Amino acid sequence: MPTIQQLVRKGRRDKIGKVKTAALKGNPQRRGVCTRVYTSTPKKPNSALRKVARVKLTSQVEVTAYIPGEGHNLQEHSMVLVRGGRVKDLPGVRYKIIRGSLDTQGVKNRKQARSRYGAKKEKS
């Protein structure tokens, strides 16, 4: 426990919080190259084959990123844009791939929440 005089001299140091998306190095998004595209199974109460990709970012860090939406065109060596955001039922997946940018196509036949999935407005 410091004395009042020690606090006057030095003050208290702020605690540094833990960054949830360290691989992005403080940027909102980061470009990367897919090294492996595969499916993974979720944690206990859920059951599915979730589409994920191993991505080597421009920050030289390799991360596992989730591919949102139905269907995708990604394969090895595809250029993708990665943002932060974890998938709750996939352990270790703390990033998501942005649909509709670089080599990633938007979701086909998407009517609602189109901007999240890079889908263009269909002509009526």
Curated annotation (Swiss-Prot):
One of its GO terms (biological process) is translation. One of its GO terms (molecular function) is rRNA binding. Residues 108-118 have a biased composition (Basic residues). Pfam families: Ribosom_S12_S23. The keyword tRNA-binding applies. GO terms for cellular component: small ribosomal subunit. Keywords: Ribonucleoprotein, Ribosomal protein, RNA-binding, rRNA-binding, tRNA-binding. It comes from the Bacteria. The keyword Lipid biosynthesis does not apply. PROSITE patterns: RIBOSOMAL_S12. InterPro entries: NA-bd_OB-fold (IPR012340), Ribosomal_uS12 (IPR006032), Ribosomal_uS12_bac (IPR005679). Residues 105-124 are annotated as: Disordered. Gene3D superfamilies: Nucleic acid-binding proteins (2.40.50.140). Belongs to the universal ribosomal protein uS12 family. With S4 and S5 plays an important role in translational accuracy. Part of the 30S ribosomal subunit. Contacts proteins S8 and S17. May interact with IF1 in the 30S initiation complex. This is Small ribosomal subunit protein uS12.
